[in-house]
Amino acid sequence: FFFSSRRRHTRLVSDWSSDVCSSDLSKLKVFSKNFNMNNNLLLFKKNKSPIGQKIIIKGKVINRRGNPLKGIIIEIWQANAAGKYRDKNDTHDAAIDPNFLGYGATKTNSNGDYKFKTILPGAYPWGNHKNAWRPKHIHFSIINENISNRLCTQMYFPNDFLLNYDPIYNSIAKKYRNSLIAKFDKKNNIVPNYLVFTFDIVL
């Protein structure tokens, strides 16, 4: 299941957002109609692993009062380790990984917690300006029964020098930028298999 609108950026927190993703999934082009709730993006092909550094993304979804939100649907989609989306409209000349779809979904538990297993996405060139590259990022879509539209954002990774040159990231007010960068979770890092990152979401 994969969206052709992959490069659309929408800010998540309503204080600094005026846009949302379309809630009408019929308007989105998909590669597969076999939607399933799977938070392990490493299991696209049985007994085969995608190329790249394995990572875990975990976090908590809360409201502005700090209360955890249960049953929130979180979708993610991303490029593979070479910076290539599994998207027929992607013109980047990197190779498609046959063992990686680049899409996952899960629901928050009663404590508002969620978790994904995936690979670290690669940066990729894009046509916004000369020599332009997008930093490593993962797209997030947040769906709540009480939200009429899907809220979307992008999660970035710490210490990525390409953030300094990315017009999408830099269009965000400085005081909010750090909220879009995942935190490396050294305490829960699983050596040697996974790097662990924390990304909390406030609705």
Model-derived features: positions:
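Single conserved hydrophobic/aromatic residue that forms the stacking wall/gate
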Residues: F1-C21
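Beta-strand-dominated extracellular/periplasmic modules and repeats
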Residues: S23-I181, I190-V202
